Amino acid sequence: MFALLFGGILADSLIKRGFKVITVRKTVNTIGFFGSSIFLILIPFQDTLVNILVLLCLVNTCSGICQGGFGVNHADLGPKYTGSLVGIAGSIGMIAAIFSPIVAGYVLEFSNSWNLIFYICSGILIIGGFYYLLFASAEKQFD
């Protein structure tokens, strides 16, 4: 929760300082996605439960911070239609939420280890982070 607030405050303060909205969105999103990816990659190399829990907390922190990026980008694209855009994007995003536990079950059955799952999640974050860097826009597209 605090990371969500921090991500929003960070993004707003950078915009108020004169940074372009798209630059701020991409920066905050990059911190969140690539930060989470790094911490997920480090998890399999830990020997203690405490270290793993700290890394998982850092993953969640980065996930909250990136909400100041893609999480509010809908309002940039179509201020009048933000609710509809969030609903459509959320519905599409739920497809992954439906299939990821199934895929994780197969991966666990195949590998008997969570390590591969952490690597897959990290890879998805890296791909998503680069995709956002390349294609994200803050220009109003729906008026």
Residue spans for each PLM region:
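Transmembrane alpha-helices of Major Facilitator/SLC transporters
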Residues: M1-I15, G32, S37, A97-F99
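Interfacial helix-cap and linker-helix signal at transmembrane-aqueous boundaries
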Residues: L10-A11, I15, V103-N112
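Paired intracellular helix-loop junctions of major facilitator superfamily
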Residues: I15-R17, N73-G83
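A membrane-interface helix-boundary motif in multi-pass transporters
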Residues: V21-T27, Y106-I124
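C-terminal transmembrane helical hairpin of 12-TM major facilitator-type secondary transporters
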Residues: I22-G69
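Cytoplasmic loop-to-transmembrane helix junctions
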Residues: V24, Y81-I88
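Multi-pass alpha-helical transporter architecture, strongest
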Residues: I43-P44, C121-D143
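Transmembrane alpha-helical cores of Major Facilitator Superfamily
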Residues: C57, T61, G87-I95
